[in-house]
Swiss-Prot record:
This is Proline--tRNA ligase. GO terms for biological process: prolyl-tRNA aminoacylation. It comes from Campylobacter lari (strain RM2100 / D67 / ATCC BAA-1060). InterPro entries: aa-tRNA-synt_IIb (IPR002314), aa-tRNA-synth_II (IPR006195), aa-tRNA-synth_II/BPL/LPL (IPR045864), Anticodon-bd (IPR004154), Anticodon-bd_dom_sf (IPR036621), Pro-tRNA-ligase_IIa (IPR002316), Pro-tRNA-synth_IIa_bac-type (IPR004500), Pro-tRNA-Synthase_IIa_type1 (IPR023717). Consists of three domains: the N-terminal catalytic domain, the editing domain and the C-terminal anticodon-binding domain.
Length: 565
């Protein structure tokens, strides 16, 4: 492709409100342009990258036996009402009416549409398993779109849905998709980890996220460098904490006067003990579809509450902070809340506290704590995983220290189970002729997001650094002076020889500095610079990842390029 015939007009100014390198460089480098809040056009350079990603995803999904479909971007609201998500999904779900007052949604995901597609058509276990996928537009009405392609409102996504007759068969497909996603990201040249994750609004269990490691990542992940354990901080687990400091000794539930001792730090100082032996109470207001109520979460004093874990324990739509006035109205004593004798309020206790002895906790009485509490003989349903796992906590698999890192989610696979098939009455006949609901899996990958992620993972202060797999062009032929006939003839010779490759011939009537700046900004892997040194039968090859300049003799240019392109 000759640059003079190509549409790629770079800009010098950073886009407004852009903070991430991928957002800045993709806009300045003419890969994308913003047309509205969270809405982007893909320009020819960006479209070439996007198509490469799509093709690799399609190749690997097809190899895995999945079948490609293309579902409508619009989904009748009746399907979302069947699943129960229409009223609970939140404002991110864009709802609208057509001219006949029929309700529709712009799909952020397509579980409902896929179930409707196979419902009453797949009727026998003999037709299972079945895996359908699509690569298409999705829409989420984000309250604060930001970070360019990483958090926009309209995006391209690969979403797949599998249907099975048993959990065991779903497990096989889940493992196959784990392997397939790993192959895709490896082919894309990205440094990634598959991490344990929370299922979020989609629901289900058996959830893994695929995270590309990047210092500007929006997600915190915990990794073990001694085994394969990795988890999103929202779902991370650890080996149970221990402490060798002396425990507080007292008869069971001895009441101590602790005037104005409201915080864990004050409590530990008052009793001269390690906060490990105290129990912290965090009260939240849980928001449900038709009610609100206060729930108290109890964790070890030196831990922090993990909000997503708490949300899952409460099975609520949202958890919000609660005022002291609201606590007092509910009969609670701020700063002195404990679960002993706590009535009329739901509460959960971190599972690591089960069977602990000689602990200190609030007495539900102003200025009093209980010492010598044994966390025993409580309903098992009270105990949930609530504490946030931190760096240097011990790996749940091998007991080595965990390391915290930053990552960007690019894929997510779920075991949905029967959540959607049961809600939408989608069933088949098993080998005994009995109706059974489909067991489902769900597999998503952010296609347009991967364009930005690749640059977050690989850039410098000058611009993008594409690997050869993703680069829109692998080589940029730059003639420093297009009026130099010999230089243009040599460039044309190289261009013609490699015309079947992804070559960009910068034949524009622009200053040399403009061409080099565009090469560095757009980030093609190599540039072949043909300038004054051609008089000495020499040209210069620039490696974009290091900006190293390599002098080549003209007679060796073709053979050298054949090796690297």
């Amino acid at each position: 492709m000759k640059f003079s015939k190509f549409y790629a007009i770079s800009t010098k100014e950073n886009p407004k409100d852009a903070t991430l390198p991928s957002h800045i460089f993709l806009v300045k480098g003419a890969f994308i342009e913003q047309i509205g809040s969270g809405l982007y056009n893909f320009l020819p350079l960006g479209k070439r990258v996007l198509d490469k990603i799509k093709n690799i995803i399609k190749e690997e999904m097809d190899k895995a036996g999945a079948l490609e479909v293309n579902l409508s971007f619009n989904t009748p609201a009746e399907l979302w009402k069947e699943s129960g998500r229409f009223n609970v999904f939140g404002k991110e779900l864009l709802r609208f009416k057509d001219r006949k007052e029929n309700d529709f949604v712009l799909g952020p995901t397509h579980e409902e549409a896929m179930v409707a597609l196979i419902r009453n058509k797949i009727t026998s276990y003999k037709q299972l398993p079945l895996h359908l996928y699509q690569i298409g537009l999705k829409f989420r009405d984000e309250a604060r779109p930001r970070f360019g392609l990483l958090r926009c409102r309209e995006f391209l996504m690969k979403d797949g849905y599998s249907f099975h007759a048993s959990e065991a068969d779903l497990d096989k497909e889940f493992n196959l998709m784990h392997e397939t996603y790993s192959k895709i990201l490896t082919r894309l040249g990205l440094d990634f980890r598959a991490v344990e994750a929370d299922s979020g609004a989609i629901g289900g269990s058996g959830s893994k996220e695929f995270m590309v490691l990047a210092k500007n990542g929006e997600d915190d992940i915990l990794l073990c460098e001694h085994c394969d354990y990795a988890a999103n901080i929202e779902a991370a687990k650890r080996t149970k904490k221990t402490c060798t400091d002396e425990r507080p000794e007292a008869d069971f539930a001895t009441q101590f006067h602790t005037p104005n001792v409201k915080t864990i730090e004050e409590l530990a100082e008052f009793f001269k003990i390690n906060p490990y032996y105290t129990i912290k109470a965090i009260a939240k207001k849980a928001i449900y579809e038709s009610e609100e109520k206060i729930i108290v979460f109890f964790i070890r004093g030196d831990d922090e509450l993990q909000e997503v874990k708490a949300l899952n324990a409460a099975n609520a739509l949202e958890l919000v902070d609660v005022s002291e006035e609201e606590l007092e109205k509910a009969g609670l004593v701020p700063g002195f809340i404990g679960f002993v004798g706590l009535n009329g309020v739901d509460f959960y206790i971190d599972h690591e506290l089960e069977n602990e002895t000689n602990m200190i906790i609030g007495a539900n009485k102003k200025d009093y704590h209980l010492v010598g509490i044994n966390v025993v003989n409580l309903n098992k349903e009270r105990f949930k995983d609530l504490a946030a796992v931190k760096e240097h906590d011990l790996c749940p698999k091998c007991q080595h220290k965990l390391k915290q890192s930053k990552g960007i989610e690019v894929g997510h696979i779920f075991k949905l189970g029967k959540k959607y098939s049961q809600a939408m009455n989608a069933s088949y006949l098993d080998e005994n002729g009995k109706a059974q609901f489909f067991t489902m899996g769900c597999y998503g990958m952010g296609v347009s997001r991967l364009v930005a992620v690749a640059i977050e993972a690989s850039h410098d202060e000058k611009g993008c650094i594409w690997n050869k797999t993703l680069a829109p062009f692998v080589l940029d032929i730059i003639v420093s002076n297009i009026k130099d006939i010999k230089a243009m003839e040599f460039a044309e010779q190289i261009y013609t020889h490699f015309k079947d490759k992804e070559i960009l011939f910068d034949d524009r009537n622009e200053r040399f500095g403009v061409k080099i700046n565009d090469f560095e900004l757009m980030g093609f892997p190599y540039a072949l610079v043909i300038g004054k040194s051609l008089e000495n039968d020499e040209v210069e090859l620039i490696h974009r990842n290091t900006l190293e300049k390599q002098v080549l003799k003209t007679q060796e240019v073709i053979s050298h390029l054949e090796k690297i392109l």
